[in-house]
Amino acid sequence: MRLLIIILAFVLMLFQYDLWFGKNGYLDYQETQQEIAVHKEENTKLSQRNQVIAAEIKDLKDGVNAIQERARLQYEMVKPNETFYRITKEHK
């Protein structure tokens, strides 16, 4: 009877080891959950960036204001009869 209890305890320990440390065990599950959380956060950031880019593309296709703004800021272009003033900081 004592031998049977020892064998059953050993088998139980093997199952517990596999449950906690084996493939698809608890530790593996926790690691996977952390990776999923990181990927969800990345996906959220990328989705927000995509929405901004899509809005900018729509504005460039449909509106003249976005094109004018880009021309003014990036290429320092002005309309006819318009004065361009550049304000710079003084270096001390």
Curated annotation (Swiss-Prot):
Gene Ontology CC terms, in alphabetical order: cell division site; cell septum; plasma membrane
Residue intervals on the Periplasmic side: 22-92
Location in the cell: Cell inner membrane
Transmembrane segments: 4-21
BP GO annotations: FtsZ-dependent cytokinesis
Cytoplasmic side: 1-3
Residues in coiled coil: 27-62
The organism's place on the tree of life at top rank: Bacteria
Topological relation to the membrane, as annotated: Single-pass type II membrane protein
Pfam families (alphabetical): DivIC
Keywords: Cell cycle, Cell division, Cell inner membrane, Cell membrane, Coiled coil, Membrane, Transmembrane, Transmembrane helix
Main subcellular location: membrane
Family: Belongs to the FtsB family.
Subunit structure: Part of a complex composed of FtsB, FtsL and FtsQ.
Role noted for this protein: Essential cell division protein. May link together the upstream cell division proteins, which are predominantly cytoplasmic, with the downstream cell division proteins, which are predominantly periplasmic.
Protein name: Cell division protein FtsB
Species for this entry: Actinobacillus succinogenes (strain ATCC 55618 / DSM 22257 / CCUG 43843 / 130Z)
Lineage of the organism: Bacteria, Pseudomonadati, Pseudomonadota, Gammaproteobacteria, Pasteurellales
